[in-house]
Amino acid sequence: MSKKFFIKTFGCQMNFNDSERIRGLLKTIGYEQTDNWEEADLIILNTCTIREKPDQKVLSHLGEYKKIKEKNPKALIAVAGCLAQRTGWELVKKAPVIDIMFSSFNMHQLPELINQAQAGYKAIAILDELPQDEDKIWEYPVERDNKYCAYVTIIKGCDKNCTYCVVPRTRGKERSRALHSILDEVKRLVDDGVREIHLLGQNVTAWGKDFEKPIPFSELLYQVSKIDGVERIRFTTGHPRDLTDDIIEAMADIPQVCNALHLPFQAGSNRILALMDRGYTKEEYLEKIEKLKEKVKDIAMSTDVIVGFPTETEEDFEHTLDVLKKVRFEQVFSFKFSPRPGTPAAEMEGQIPDDVKTERMRRLLELQKSILSEIAKKYEGTVQEVLVEEEKNGELIGRTTTNKWASFKGDPSLLGKIVKIKVIKSSPFSLEGELLEVIK
């Protein structure tokens, strides 16, 4: 009987893509996935450490999962991802139930680490940078949940060194994946029925800059769009400093590139942006948004915002609210500032009391709620293109080019098709419609 594994993933799309690769790798060595951790022979926590809350969740889950050892003493517990990278042996000392620990840099070593752990050793392998044999990571099959949309990691790491962020420590310096490797994976995915390609990176718009002969990210967009069968292209996450005019032009020029973009601004105050070391001003950010809206028809913007960064005043916070009012984002991921160990911001004077952060967060969410209500109304009566991804409770569900979930009545044979629907009802995060026609 084959062994079973259970995997729980925290954090960003990069982590979810890493988990897809881990799942594919484990299946090549005879493991089967289970949704019940209590029957697993191997439990993997793929972790995030961008804020304190995910750290605490991991420790809580480890406390729960250790019960499996009583039932199955040979069961193994593994911790992967950014928390593993940041803490290493420190976490193992806190939670000795951990048998295996590895980072995103050496996922391909997991079979070897399992063998070490089964022999009774603590299999802890944390690398500070991508190994020379990193291409092995891309060779293993990816086990996806979505048949029609696929993540493709194109760059790892980040060189920006924002003062609040642990990503440069946990994911390393920016290292772009080779163009031929990306295109080969996209071709394989399309051959497998994928219609939407989602390019991923901590700073996806910096792709190609670290090559001996740099290649602009816009060129990658053109190359991917030329692959027969690629119907949609998305990319996440870009950095405002690297969103150049040629990328905006490519977004406008390439039919497959969706009119949706996630572009974190983090704070509206130039003083706070300087303390964060973001490398742009409020005015420069808004200028890029203006160019995007001018060039890319009906573009839907989403963003990240940090509330309560050290020394943030009421005036600073008002600048953040002003950006929300001016841009009118369709989705805002907002977080109270969480000091991360080893970052300059954690040591700054003027830490903001939690009750002040909470109150500012309340006001931000209230403003964004009113903006979303107004945006939702504009969708009613419009015609939207939807890639049908799943059937649920007798309805077909997919996403528009603007990344809105949409549902409508239709035959399951439409799964994987791109259709037009007329929106008859809208809410801030989803649409309901009626089928008009099948496009392709």
UniProtKB/Swiss-Prot annotation:
Iron in keyword set: yes
Amino acids binding [4Fe-4S] cluster 1: C12, C48, C82
Compartmental location: Cytoplasm
Catalytic activity reported: N(6)-dimethylallyladenosine(37) in tRNA + (sulfur carrier)-SH + AH2 + 2 S-adenosyl-L-methionine = 2-methylsulfanyl-N(6)-dimethylallyladenosine(37) in tRNA + (sulfur carrier)-H + 5'-deoxyadenosine + L-methionine + A + S-adenosyl-L-homocysteine + 2 H(+)
Binding positions ([4Fe-4S] cluster 2): C158, C162, C165
GO CC terms in record: cytosol
EC number(s) given by UniProt: 2.8.4.3
The Radical SAM core domain, residue ranges: 144-374
Pfam family for this entry, one: TRAM
Keywords linked to the UniProt accession: 4Fe-4S, Cytoplasm, Iron, Iron-sulfur, Metal-binding, S-adenosyl-L-methionine, Transferase, tRNA processing
Physiological role: Catalyzes the methylthiolation of N6-(dimethylallyl)adenosine (i(6)A), leading to the formation of 2-methylthio-N6-(dimethylallyl)adenosine (ms(2)i(6)A) at position 37 in tRNAs that read codons beginning with uridine.
Assembly and interaction partners: Monomer.
Family of the protein in this entry: Belongs to the methylthiotransferase family. MiaB subfamily.
Xref: HAMAP family: tRNA_metthiotr_MiaB
Record's protein name: tRNA-2-methylthio-N(6)-dimethylallyladenosine synthase
